[in-house]
Structures are given as structure tokens and as C-alpha cells.
């Protein structure tokens, strides 16, 4: 019985030591820059290939005519590269997709300096669903760096 107790005690101590070591490693793991207290979950559609395609569509299509190259803003439409959303509440990926899909009618534009409507699905570009996902991925990266 004495040997059994000793084995049990050693096993228990080893388990506690291992668990303590795992716990302290996790506690010391670096927090990603800008993550604050909780790490941000990147939407599944925000992939390097989607971002590259979205960049190409945005900056070579009619998006940049209004929003400026790189989404820096222009006379006709707001900047998309900051945290000050004009039409969106949160700037979530889903919200960005929704705006690209439905557009923004002139009477719904919240900035009095800008009165030009944003066409649904990129207006004349008539973006496909995969292209909308790509443009949304690109725009998402402009504000979620």
C-alpha cells in the first residue's frame, strides 16, 4: 500500500507540473498587435488570393473612380481606408458585402457633401458573387490592419 501511495503521489505531482507548465506557456503567448484583449477572427473569405483579386478589381475598375486608388476617398465617395464608416455601422465583412450587393441610393447617402449613388453590384461592372467577395475582402483589409 505504501508503494501504491508513492506511485499515485508521483503521478499526481507530474500531472500538476505538466498542467502548470502548459498553463504558464499559454499565459505568456504574445498577443497579436492591435488585438487588444481578444484576438480578431478574420472572415474565411479574406484570403490572400481574394484580397489580390479584389485589389485588382477595385483599383482597375469603377470603384476607384469614386473611392480613390487604394480607397483613400475622393470627391464622389468616402475613404474606405480608415475607421470612420459613413454608411456602415460596424465595418464587418458581411456589411461590406451587403453594401456592394445592394449599392447606396442617392437618397440614403449620409454625407451631405456627396450625392452620387453607388450602383448595386459595382454598377456598370455588374460584379459576380465571387468578385463581390473579393472586393469585400480587399476593402475589409483597408480598415482591419
PLM feature segments, named:
Residues 123-145:
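C-terminal capping alpha-helices of c-type cytochrome domains
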Residues 27, 105-112:
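Proline-centered turn/helix-capping motifs that create local helix->coil transitions or kinks
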Residues 51, 69-101, 117-123:
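Gly/Gly-Pro-rich "capping" loops immediately C-terminal to redox-active cysteine motifs
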